[in-house]
Curated annotation (Swiss-Prot):
Pathway: Protein modification; protein lipoylation via endogenous pathway; protein N(6)-(lipoyl)lysine from octanoyl-[acyl-carrier-protein]: step 1/2. The lineage of its organism: Bacteria, Pseudomonadati, Pseudomonadota, Gammaproteobacteria, Legionellales. This is Octanoyltransferase. It catalyses: octanoyl-[ACP] + L-lysyl-[protein] = N(6)-octanoyl-L-lysyl-[protein] + holo-[ACP] + H(+). It comes from Coxiella burnetii (strain RSA 493 / Nine Mile phase I). The keyword Transferase applies.
Length: 242
């Protein structure tokens, strides 16, 4: 069993600084760094993946469009959508990228089935679907065995912005959400359902759960930890030189 830290961000988070925080964490983590999962909701934003094609953005309007370094095509993030950013050491977990994606899909589908929603993954396209409607999108990046980015689960949101794009590069793809099947639905209830399943399916111990009131605190925490490790290295180096 491995350890994991779960961070729940308490406010709507803009995409750009969160993306930069993921990159910083991933670039500076080491083999002994504890895995983290970040739960949050974003301010409205379209994100274009590495494989993204301009023709799939039909009309972004006043919503920002950010080209990012995850896999996949264009999608939408906004309030009422649960983001789970998975900052994991796949080598330590013994997972290939393909198995990692399938485990995410199966875990999300299993959590939705607990709400009576007949969700499942598809062999032909990443994500989780209810019939032919997409309820959860997955976009990842793996660098040196470390994953970042993650999944977007539609809970109770305004789905209208999805009509401004071809979601995930599929023309005519219909998006759905938990609220269409379970109403009312609370975000915290969804988290309480999905967290234990992630722990079980990925082999994690009971997590340390931290509620963050600002992204700045999150970034500062990682930078401080990195600085402390550098200080320890300098102390060891100096002692050897002396």
């Amino acid at each position: 069993m491995n350890d994991v830290i779960i961070r729940q961000l308490a406010h709507l988070i803009p995409y750009q600084p969160l993306w930069e925080a993921m990159q910083t964490f991933t670039a500076r983590r080491q083999s002994q760094t504890t895995d983290e999962i970040w739960f949050l909701e974003h301010e409205p934003v379209f994100t274009q993946g590495l494989a993204g094609k301009p023709e799939h953005v039909l009309n972004s309007g006043n919503i920002p469009l950010i080209r990012t370094d995850r896999g996949g095509q264009v999608t939408y993030h906004g309030p009422g959508q649960l983001m789970m950013y998975l900052l994991l050491d796949l080598n330590r977990l013994g997972l290939s990228t393909r198995t990692f994606v399938r485990t995410i899909e199966n875990t999300v589908a299993e959590s939705l089935q607990e709400w009576g929603i007949p969700a499942q993954g598809k062999e032909t396209a990443p994500g989780v679907y209810v019939d032919d409607k997409k309820i959860c999108s997955i976009g990842l990046r793996v660098r040196k065995g470390f994953s970042y980015h993650g999944l977007a689960l539609n809970v109770a949101m305004d789905l209208t912005p999805f009509s401004c794009i071809n979601p995930c590069g599929f023309k005519g793809l219909t998006m759905t959400q938990i609220q269409d099947y379970v109403n009312p639905i609370e975000m915290d209830a969804v988290k309480r359902t999905i967290i234990p399943l992630f722990l079980k399916n990925f082999g994690y111990n009971q997590p340390a759960i931290m509620v963050e009131t600002s992204l700045e605190f999150l970034i500062d925490d990682h930078l401080r930890s990195f600085s402390e490790k550098l200080g320890e290295r300098e102390t060891v180096t100096n002692s050897r030189q002396n």
